[in-house]
Structure formats: structure tokens, C-alpha cells
Amino acid sequence: MKEAGQMQNLESARAGRSVSTQTGSMTGQIPRLSKVNLFTLLSLWMELFPAVEAQRQKSQKNEEGKHGPLGDNEEMTRVSTDKRQVKRTGLVVVKNMKIVGLHCSSEDLHAGQIALIKHGSRLKNCDLYFSRKPCSACLKMIVNAGVNRISYWPADPEISLLTEASSSEDAKLDAKAVERLKSNSRAHVCVLLQPLVCYMVQFVEETSYKCDFIQKITKTLPDANTDFYYERKQERIKEYEMLFLVSNEEMHKQILMTIGLENLCENPYFSNLRQNMKDLILLLATVASSVPNFKHFGFYRSNPEQINEIHNQSLPQEIARHCMVQARLLAYRTEDHKTGVGAVIWAEGKSRSCDGTGAMYFVGCGYNAFPVGSEYADFPHMDDKQKDREIRKFRYIIHAERNALTFRCQEIKPEERSMIFVTKCPCDECVPLIKGAGIKQIYAGDVDVGKKKADISYMRFGELEGVSKFTWQLNPSGAYGLEQNEPERRENGVLRPVPQKEEQHQDKKLCLGIH
């Protein structure tokens, strides 16, 4: 029972560290996301990167233009079948327990192939977290690069075993090839899923509803139905369960046996596995719903002057929200008992690359934490309610923005558009660091802008010049004078309504796009 024993050992060995520091050595008083679960959730979330869907639609239009809408050409039919059989896949590249790459499949390349192109020999001794078990074509290359460990989500693999196309036996043959590569390679190919710590789901639900983005909506639109958040969360749960779970338990067992996890098909291992997967999907859906596509809210400039300059142009709202959810996930690794903050830095190259993220590439990320290597009792943890200023935390905690800059894996290039996504407004100490690093855009909430608190102030953000600031707010352009319930989409800085027919199928597109 190798795989089952493997999961048990990992769960017991790491359960105590699931509330650990940057170094995994400290235990806190609030539930925290383990690094393994964080990397797993980010891989699932990267599978949903919006740019991939746009590429798929563009490719479909191009193919229809070449072959006609019926696709009666035999070669066209074969290619279409192959693409339906290959599932979109997200990937997180980790080195020394630090994230050095966030990737997803593109129209032409699998996630593992993209990682090899982007990182090359630097993949040596890295850990890779896939949202699906990689195919043999990817596995042989990344194993050859000398990776340390490959973890994957134990559901339908990259070469789908669920689609009708798999009846050709190609998917089963690929699964056998993957198992042979696994058994004869130095890299450890495994499933790393840990049970969430006690009260983690409840904690995420409470903090997601109370986060700056949801609270800004309720304050700006006091007449809005307060159930909108919970309705969107339920929609996301259904959508993600369709994507990341195999609804039929017997079919799930069949897939597990085919991909070499037959020992997980027996209870209690199978029931525990599915429960852990459901809990993580619930957590992901909850966090994703905290930055909702709601009416005319999004990340906008308060004063849209010089909007035509490239560094002042906003990202499409779908991508901005996606990146902010990445930061929200990172915030659940916080060591601050009061306020969890996450930050992620991306940059946009001059031309579209092979990655499913298009021209955008990952630079760095972080969350607020105490210095690396610290133990729980090394530093004070009290906030400004403590009268004795000597035992307050603010002199010792390192903010998320600073950790993102410190542990970045790419240099920030002055000629490129770089952007940081922060779950809360940057404080007066972080603002000059962001500007000094050469970051061109800041995406954040504005609930604390202009406030001065006991130990920290947020006065500089509003006065900051030379960096474009996109804050979560109701669209200031006045375009929301349309029907209040009419959906919207912001593409390339232009706000336009979504046709009713498109709106009705918006949630289904991600599910349909993976087959």
C-alpha cells in the first residue's frame, strides 16, 4: 500500500507544520494553509487563467476560417479530437519552498513543456505541482531536467481518461508510459494532499466575506442584496467540482487504478482522498468569490488621465481579478494574527510568449511574515491594542510587498509593464519600495487609503506619482449608467456589455473549454 502509506506519512508528518512560518518552523494561533496545499491550490487556479480561454476561442475561429464550420476534413477532425483529449493544466514551480514559476497550458504547448522552455536546467532540484497528472511527453522531459518531486491532483489526468476520445486506448497507453517513467526515474512522482487544519474552511469563509473587496461593494451599494457573495460562491463550487472532481465515484476509482493509484481505491483512503479534494475545492471557490465579477466593480484608476500610455493601461478585468485571487490565497500563509496580506508581482513582456498566460510572466510573491528562521516566541505578536509599544509586532513583521520583492525570481525590467497585486492598500513604508523597484502598476483595495493608525499609516498611496494605481471600486467612467443588472466586461481598457446569450453560458465556458 505504498501510495496510501505515503499519504498517511505526509499527513502526519506535516500536519503540525501546516500553521508554520516562512521556514515551516513556527506554530501560530490562527489556522493557516500549508505550503503544499497552497501550491496545489495555485496549480488548480492557474488552470483557469483567463488568457487561455481567449486563445482557445481565437484558435477555433482560425480553424473554422481554414476548414469551414463543419470541420469535414479528416485531418481537422483528428486534430480537434486530440485537443479535446488534452486537458488544460496549471503548474507551480517551486525551489527551496519558494515559488519561482506560475504557468498554464497554451494552445500549442503543455504546461510541462512550457516549464522546460522557461526554466531549462534551472528546473534541477525543483518541485513541480501540476493540476493534473502530466503526460508522458512532459514527464520524460522534466524528469530528464533533474526535478526533485512532481506532485499532481489525483483526478482526470492531462491526457483525459474521461472524454470519448480516450476510447482509442491512447490515453491508457500514455498512462502506462507515465507509470514506467515514474518507476525508473529519480524524481519522486506522487500525490501531496494534506487535510486542512481545524476550522480552516470556516476561517476562510469568514475572512473572505469580510475582505476589502466584498466590504467595498456592500458599502458602496448599501441596497445590494447581501446574498450575492454566497450565490457566487455556490456557482463557483459547482463549476470547480465539474472541473476538478470526478463526480462518479466508481469512475474516479477506475481512473486512479489506471494512473497507478490503485491503493487509494480502498476505504478509508478513498473516502479521505475525496473529502480532502472537496475541502480544497470549497476553499478555492470561497477565495475566488471574494474578488467577484459583480455589476460594474473592478480595478480602475480614479483619475483616468494619460490612459493611452501603455504603462497606464489597465489589464483586462478577468486577468486582474485572477491575479488578485492568487494574492488572496497567499494571504492564508500569513503569520499576522490580525491581518493576512498577500502580494504577487507579474510583468508583461513585449510579445506574446509560449505560455498560456500570454505575454505575462510571474516575477515573485509573498505574504506578511516574521523573518526567515524565526520561532514562534522570538518576536512580539501584539497589535496596537497593546499599550506597551515595545511588545507590538509592527517593528518585526515583514509585509507581503517586501517579501514579494525580496524573494522575486525575475528582475524587474524598466522597459516592461510590471504590476503588483496586493490584497490591502500598501502602507507608507512599502509604497516607496514598490516605486523604487520600478513597478509600473499597483492593484489593491482602497479601504485604508488616507488613514493613519497607531503603528502604521496609508497616507503616501493616494499621493503616489509615477506609478499607476488601480483600486477596487465602482467604474468611475460613468459607463455603469446602463441597466444596473446588465453584465459587463473590460477588455484592453474598454468597457462593453456582454450579450445576454454569452452571459447565460459564461460559467459553462471554462468547463467546455477543457475537453
UniProtKB/Swiss-Prot annotation:
Boundaries of every CMP/dCMP-type deaminase domain copy: 71-169, 318-483
Residue spans crossing the bilayer: none
InterPro entries documented for this protein: APOBEC/CMP_deaminase_Zn-bd, CMP_dCMP_dom, Cytidine_deaminase-like, dCMP_deaminase-rel, Deoxycytidylate_deaminase_dom
Region of interest: Disordered: 1-27, 56-83, 494-515
Record PROSITE patterns: CYT_DCMP_DEAMINASES_1, CYT_DCMP_DEAMINASES_2
Keyword Cytoplasm assigned: yes
GO biological process, one term: cytidine deamination
Motif (Bipartite nuclear localization signal): 489-511
Protein's UniProt keywords contain Metal-binding: yes
Pfam families: dCMP_cyt_deam_1 (PF00383)
Basic and acidic residues composition bias: residue spans: 60-83
Gene Ontology CC, one term: cytoplasm
Active site: 401
Enzyme class, spelled out: hydrolase
EC number: 3.5.4.5
Coiled-coil ranges from the UniProt annotation: none
Binding site for Zn(2+) 2: 399, 427, 430
Names of the cofactor(s): Zn(2+)
Annotated GO MF terms: cytidine deaminase activity; dCMP deaminase activity; zinc ion binding
Entry's family note: Belongs to the cytidine and deoxycytidylate deaminase family.
UniProt name for this protein: Cytidine and dCMP deaminase domain-containing protein 1
